Amino acid sequence: MKRSAFFISDGTGITAETLGQSLLAQFENITFAKFTRPYIDSVDKARAMVQQINLAAEKDGFRPIIFDTIVNQDIREILATSNGFMIDIFSTFLAPLEQELSEHSSYSVGKSHSIGHNSNYMERIEAVNFALDNDDGARTHYYDKADLILVGVSRCGKTPTCLYMAMQFGIRAANYPLTEDDMEHLTLPAALRAHSHKLFGLTIDPDRLTAIRNERKPNSRYSSYAQCEFEVREVENLFRRENIAHINSTHFSVEEISAKILVEKGVERRFK
């Protein structure tokens, strides 16, 4: 079965999309065609949106699922005339919160993502810059300022994990690729020894690593199964020998990997 799903907002759409994606992921037997529609902030845009939803309903033979975070009541009422199943995120959660807190909501558009109301903005930018500056072992003399240092073979997911933790939580994460030379010495590189308490290892199944590396350097020694299997085996041995906590990234999303790392290392998010 295939259904259409719309994430509609009068702001960036991040909240509607994030919550909507999480809910739809629980229905593994249904394929969803997903459409994010940010900045639906006028009556005219809302009417055009209704036309899109109705066209999708006619094409699919099922009414689309709509997740919205629209603040304006007039716009919400227009969207409600569409041939879609509407889940109004704000009205679902704000009313009981207002009752519990004995306080009326401000009903402000884009409140959670605006720079002016987000004291975490600069923290996020600094963390992203740190992750980029300290990517792939390019620099090691700022490791004293790192919250975490991810280590593992090349192409096992270190960079996207560092960037995700920087963007989402303000974590200053560096990463260092362990090479064949490092494995031959049977010990941590000198640049990492002084920061062993910050290290967390990522490993990966050799066949998955082979597929990833073949996209970058096909038919090379670097991407051969034998080389990938050797590197993964030796790095896992190093992790055990040096007592470095680690996880296999093969079957986890970057979100899951990041959450597991923070729990395992006990690192507090700079913002939540």
Curated annotation (Swiss-Prot):
Binding of ADP, residues: 152-159
Catalytic activity: [pyruvate, water dikinase] + ADP = [pyruvate, water dikinase]-phosphate + AMP + H(+); [pyruvate, water dikinase]-phosphate + phosphate + H(+) = [pyruvate, water dikinase] + diphosphate
Molecular function terms from GO: ADP binding; ATP binding; phosphotransferase activity, phosphate group as acceptor; protein serine/threonine kinase activity
Pfam families attached to this UniProt entry: Kinase-PPPase
InterPro entries to which the protein is assigned, alphabetical: Kinase-pyrophosphorylase, PSRP
Sorted UniProt keywords: Kinase, Nucleotide-binding, Serine/threonine-protein kinase, Transferase
Enzyme Commission (EC) number: 2.7.11.33, 2.7.4.28
Domain of life: Bacteria
Main function: Bifunctional serine/threonine kinase and phosphorylase involved in the regulation of the phosphoenolpyruvate synthase (PEPS) by catalyzing its phosphorylation/dephosphorylation.
Cited HAMAP family: PSRP
Similarity comment: family membership: Belongs to the pyruvate, phosphate/water dikinase regulatory protein family. PSRP subfamily.
Official protein name in the record: Putative phosphoenolpyruvate synthase regulatory protein
Organism listed in the record: Pseudomonas fluorescens (strain SBW25)
